Design a protein with these regions (language model features):
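Extended, folded cores of ATP/NTP-driven motor/assembly subunits in large transport
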Residues: 1-358
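P-loop NTPase motor domains
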Residues: 31, 41, 53-71, 213, ...
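Conserved nucleotide-binding/hydrolysis micro-motifs of P-loop NTPases
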Residues: 45-48, 81-84, 426-428, 446-448, ...
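P-loop NTPase motor core of the ASCE superfamily
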Residues: 114-117, 146-147, 161, 392, ...
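Generic beta-strand/beta-sheet core signal
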Residues: 293, 321, 371-373, 382-385, ...
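Pre-Walker A (Motif I) flank of P-loop NTPase domains
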Residues: 378, 386-392, 559
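Glycine-rich phosphate-binding P-loop
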Residues: 387-409
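Walker A/P-loop NTP-binding active-site region of P-loop NTPases
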Residues: 403-453
């Protein structure tokens, strides 16, 4: 497909017309078509098909209000998106650092190319384009539209004159001569134009036209919208209502039965007239045209018939623009509107429901792969660090792919240069850490940590933050604190740090920190602290002393650092150790502003105690301030959502992944996320890796996918692990 790429300062000759009245395009002080300046926006896609009902209604209400605010004619244009695999892969490749990242990228790139090639529904971009006589006039209109879009929560991006020139060149097939016939245009291939008939179904679902986009060969879909002024709309509706009433009287005089279709038209006209009179809606004339292309006549006939069948299934007919192919083609081009092809009236709600920017896939090229959309097969690429909250939560039952998903997220963030910090309760990420050249610290198997150490701290507030964290940790060790024990613990902690020479001054933070045994000794010396000291004794000097008495702090400079807890047999001890590990990793997070991913598997285990839940909620709120992304995963869905902190934590996560559920878990998610019954059934019957992916206000059905290299590093299936041990080889370096 040829493209017209015009530099901003160039002044080329206008394109020669290929039919009478063909528009002329050129650069002057911007991109002009027939001397009219053209500008506009790209509209972000809306994933309506799996939005909850209330969310979908709110989105359509905002879209209707946005379109009502545009008082002049405009063009809604949907064209195929040019999204080659290298657009995303080249961005990721620039960030690779080291041999291990390069090896992982090779497998990742192969997987991504495979997904791009297997997509069943072409990706599309949707534009809202207007024209004006002068730059100041068009600029004022564009500024107004941008402001209204922001007020209504719609994401739009102003397109440059060069981009509009490229769109015009693509749709006009610039540089490729075409001979216009009765039914087709013939050049290097064949194309035809079809228009939606004026008779539409009485009721439509939001985004109902999206089904037409799945037919191969759709080169462009355009809606020419001509809003009517209030007086003009009232006159039109009054005339329409009089016609209906007159027809009803004539039918009654003839003794004919009431016509249901006529009654519907009368009721619709009455409701629309009241809405326009009250100023709560607008009437627009809309002309909808589709451009269909094919390499030969047989294929064109086949695609035309497929498009007609799809349209009939939606309750509308398609009419070929016979003898008016040039007019219909011109109607799709950016610029002033030509003569209408099959114009009909729509109210605000109907126009919003017929939106062209509907999508079921998500694409942010600076991010990384999350899976593929179930409806289109298109790869889902997201950049979590580009969202207001970088956090994510993964909810799924055992065996639904939580570990595989979280491990793949760690690996792909590593490829982007993000530092990986993780707490691994079951030892699932040991092979991943080894393959990435990271450090794996296994508590209970000879390794330990010292939660009292101040690692990488640079401010005077660091000591106060450490004392607050230790208060939570020791409360968890002791099974809670009484009203008298809390001040006693605070005094013992402060005295221990002072005795070690560590003060609020950051210059003292590198000194040897106190130990839990030091704190317990000071508690035992106080009357109020005696019972607490006895409850902490086994952690300080008893059988568990080795867990938190490491003399060397965790390495602060490792790209990948994972703390494993699988060697700790006691579940209660493991929960406390998980909280301690998180506290140490949190010190590393606050040490600098480099991008970091903090993964907490089995998060509910640490949240069962109020001190742990409070700390997780604080991490979720504060992570973005340190350029960190928190990723939580749990299988205890019902307990998590019912907890006092569960809702607050989920609200701090812009990315929410729902994998396979039990019926009880699915019911809890239906209530919490306002899911539909089809979505509930999909979660109950989901295979491993299948589920729903929420991104901000949108969500879509998706399937998580991994390369063979990632699978080898992350699988927990016993059969796979036995096979790997028998082969006695490292995970493969490429897929």
């Amino acid at each position: 497909m040829s493209r017209l790429r015009l530099p901003a300062r160039a002044r080329p000759k206008a394109a020669a017309p290929r039919a009478d009245g063909w528009p002329r395009a050129a650069f002057d002080d911007g991109f002009r078509v027939d001397s009219r300046l053209v500008g506009g926006f790209e509209l972000a896609p809306l994933s309506l098909e799996l939005m909850a009902e209330t969310e979908r209604d709110a989105a359509l209400e905002g879209l209707a209000a946005f379109e009502d605010a545009i008082a002049r004619p405009y063009l809604l244009l949907s064209v195929p998106a040019d999204r080659p695999p290298h657009e995303h892969l080249s961005i990721l490749e620039e960030r690779l650092d080291g041999r291990r990242a390069a090896a992982g990228f090779s497998a990742y790139a192969a997987l991504y190319r495979e997904l791009c090639a297997a997509a069943t529904r072409p990706l599309r971009r949707t534009y809202l384009l207007l024209d004006g006589a002068s730059g100041p006039e068009l600029g004022r209109v564009i500024a107004t539209i941008a402001r209204v879009a922001e007020e209504r929560g719609l994401v739009v991006r102003e397109v440059s004159p060069n981009e509009i020139a490229g769109i015009w060149g693509d749709v006009a097939r610039a540089g490729v001569p075409h001979r216009i016939g009765v039914h087709t245009g013939e050049g290097d291939g064949l194309l035809t134009a079809l228009a939606l008939s004026r008779r539409w179904p009485a009721e439509v679902a939001p985004g109902w036209l999206a089904g037409l986009f799945a037919v191969p060969g759709i080169a462009a879909v355009a809606m020419r919208v001509r809003p009517l002024a209030r007086a003009e709309a009232m006159g039109f509706l009054t005339t329409r209502l009089r016609q209906v009433r007159a027809a009803e009287r004539i039918a009654a005089e003839r003794g004919e039965l009431a016509d249901v279709e006529r009654e519907r038209l009368g009721a619709t006209a009455t409701d629309a007239r009241r809405a326009v009179h009250a100023g709560s809606g607008r009437i627009s004339f809309v002309d909808t045209v589709l451009l269909l292309e094919a390499p030969d006549r047989a294929t064109l006939a086949e695609r035309t018939e497929a498009l007609r069948l799809e349209a009939r299934s939606l309750g509308v007919d398609l009419e070929t623009a016979s003898f008016r192919i040039a007019d219909a083609w011109t109607a799709i081009l950016p610029g002033p509107a030509p003569r209408p092809i099959a114009e009909r009236n729509l109210d605000s709600a109907s126009l919003a429901a017929s939106l062209l920017n509907v999508a079921s896939d998500l694409y942010e090229p600076a991010g990384h792969l999350y899976g593929r959309a179930r409806t289109s097969g298109a790869p889902i690429v997201l950049d979590r660090f580009a969202h207001a909250s970088h956090n994510a939560i993964v909810l799924g039952q055992t065996g639904t792919g939580k570990t595989m998903f979280s491990g793949a997220e760690m690996h792909r963030c590593f490829l982007r240069g993000v530092r990986i910090l993780a707490v691994d309760p079951l030892g699932d990420y040991r092979r991943l850490a080894s393959a990435l050249g990271g450090t794996y610290v296994e508590l209970g198997a000879g390794d330990g940590l010292n939660p009292f150490a101040l690692v990488g701290t640079t401010t005077e507030r660091s000591l106060s933050a450490k004392l607050a964290m230790l208060d939570r940790l020791l409360a968890a060790m002791a099974g809670g604190l009484s009203r008298d024990e809390r001040p006693a613990l605070d005094r013992a902690l402060r005295a221990s740090y002072t005795a070690a020479g560590i003060l609020p001054d950051p210059a003292t933070h590198g000194r040897r920190p106190p130990t839990l045994a030091d704190v317990v000794e000071r508690l035992a010396a106080e009357p109020e602290g005696g019972p607490l000291a006895r409850r902490l004794e086994r952690w300080a000097t008893g059988s568990l002393a080795g867990l938190f008495a490491a003399s060397v702090p965790l390495p602060a400079d490792r790209r990948v650092l994972v703390v494993g807890l699988a060697a700790i047999g006691d579940p209660e001890v493991r929960d406390v150790a998980q909280l301690a590990a998180l506290s140490v990793l949190w010190d590393l997070v606050r040490a600098d502003l480099s991008p970091k991913l903090v993964v907490v598997d089995e998060a509910w285990k640490v949240m069962r105690q109020s001190s742990g839940a409070d700390f997780i909620e604080e991490l979720a709120r504060s992570a973005r301030h340190y350029h960190a992304a928190l990723q939580l995963a749990t299988q205890d869905i019902v307990e998590f959502l019912r907890s006092p902190f569960g809702e607050a934590i989920v609200k701090q996560c812009d990315l929410r992944v729902l994998l396979g559920q039990t019926p009880e878990g699915a019911d809890a998610l239906v209530r919490f996320f306002d899911l539909t019954q089809p979505e509930r059934r999909a979660l109950v019957h989901a295979r491993p890796g299948e589920g729903l992916l929420f991104v901000g206000r949108s969500h879509t059905a998706f399937e998580a996918v991994v390369s063979r290299r990632e699978y080898a590093m992350l699988t927990t299936r016993p059969a796979d692990l036995v096979a790997q041990s028998q082969l006695k080889c490292e995970p493969p370096d490429s897929s």
